[in-house]
UniProtKB/Swiss-Prot annotation:
Catalytic activity, as annotated: a lipid A disaccharide + ATP = a lipid IVA + ADP + H(+)
Gene: lpxK
Gene Ontology MF annotations: ATP binding; tetraacyldisaccharide 4'-kinase activity
Protein name: Tetraacyldisaccharide 4'-kinase
Matches recorded under NCBIfam families: lpxK
Record keywords: ATP-binding, Kinase, Lipid A biosynthesis, Lipid biosynthesis, Lipid metabolism, Nucleotide-binding, Transferase
GO terms under cellular component: plasma membrane
Pfam families, sorted: LpxK
InterPro entries membership: LpxK, P-loop_NTPase
Length: 334
């Protein structure tokens, strides 16, 4: 188990040694709060785009189902006739230049796995750059857009925003409620009181704290051909190799179990790069991975490898609320 994995386990399950990190946590909180205060007190330090910007992010380290929800937001806006673009940091990407416009045919190493997945699924204009304000400017120079979604970037205050959506894993919550490195929080818990909406992945119902959304499996897709298979493609009890290089791989393995399969889990680091040798497992069984991993494995995937396609399903109340926000932000287009 890596140091990062040990830390995550301690954050969510508790460990007395975390108290030794309290001085570093205090320093981290002071830096984060001072940085945020600087941007709030001087609006000139942030770039405000000529179109509304919606930030979709986390205050916790690790996976919360952000990419599926961004896909839902994109498709929902597109169904309403809105021209939507996306900016992303492009984590682990090595583009030839910055900012970099992501195309569906680009290799994952140029784009990052999540931006490439988003473009391949939706065709949306997407620009990557750690400087998200610069990414927005570049995107608007190329495309006439009505709305921009920022994939993550809640803490990137150089980009002014009109709406902040924060996602939390309902099962793990905020862990021990402490900031890095003593806990999983990028910002103090009080930050949740300042955002526009909180969404809980896996919650049974809406609460006063926020809206519920779920990730529902819709089918399997073969990597080598793109053929779609129904969820009953494998019978109940089928043993298979399960590959996940995401922030919370256990959630993927649990999902496969809810489909009555018997996954042999193979967890990799978030945003991991793969080689064919890494994915040679024994015994020979069907292999199922996440869609995020699939964009990096299509080039060498043999017949039979597939990914589980999921879709975000937000609560009716959130859909109504979000439509109201779109009408407020874009009154001429509603």
């Amino acid at each position: 188990m890596s140091v990062a994995e040990r830390l995550q386990r301690a954050w969510y399950q508790g460990h007395p040694a975390l108290c030794l990190l309290a001085p570093l946590e205090l320093l981290y909180r002071r830096v984060v709060e001072a940085r945020r205060r600087r941007f709030l007190e001087d609006p000139n330090t942030s770039y405000r785009a000529p179109v509304p910007v919606v930030v979709v992010g986390n205050i916790t380290v690790g996976g919360t189902g952000k990419t599926p929800l961004i896909l839902w937001l994109i498709e929902h806006c597109q169904r309403r006739g809105l021209r939507v673009g996306v900016v992303s940091r492009g984590y682990a990407a090595e583009p030839p230049t910055l900012p970099w416009r992501v195309r569906a045919e680009h290799p994952a190493q140029h784009c990052g796995d999540e931006p490439l997945l988003i473009v391949q699924r939706t065709g949306v204009p997407l620009m990557i750059d750690p400087d998200r304000a610069r990414a927005v400017r570049a995107l608007l120079q190329q495309e006439p857009l009505d709305l921009i979604l920022s994939d993550d970037g809640l803490q990137h205050y150089r980009l002014a925003r009109d709406l902040e959506l924060v996602l939390i894993d309902a099962a793990r919550g905020l862990g021990n409620g402490r900031c890095l490195p003593a806990g999983p929080l990028r910002e103090p818990p009080e930050r949740l009181g300042e955002v526009d909406a909180v969404l809980f992945n896996g919650a049974a119902a809406d609460t006063v704290e926020g809206y519920a959304f779920s990730l529902q499996p819709v089918g399997l897709v073969e990597l080598s051909t793109g053929r779609r298979w129904p969820l009953d493609h494998y019978p109940a009890g089928q043993q298979l190799h399960a590959v996940a290089g995401i922030g919370n791989p256990q959630r993927f393995f649990d999902t496969l179990e809810t489909l009555h399969w018997r996954p042999i889990p193979h967890a990799f680091a978030d945003h991991a790069d793969y080689s064919p040798e890494q994915l040679k497992f024994s015994p020979e069984l069907p292999l199922v991975m996440t869609e995020k991993d699939a964009v990096k494995c299509r080039a060498f995937a043999p017949p039979g490898w597939s990914y589980l396609q999921v879709q975000a399903v937000p609560s009716t109340a959130f859909v109504t609320w979000f439509d109201d926000q779109l009408a407020r932000l874009l009154p001429d287009l509603s």
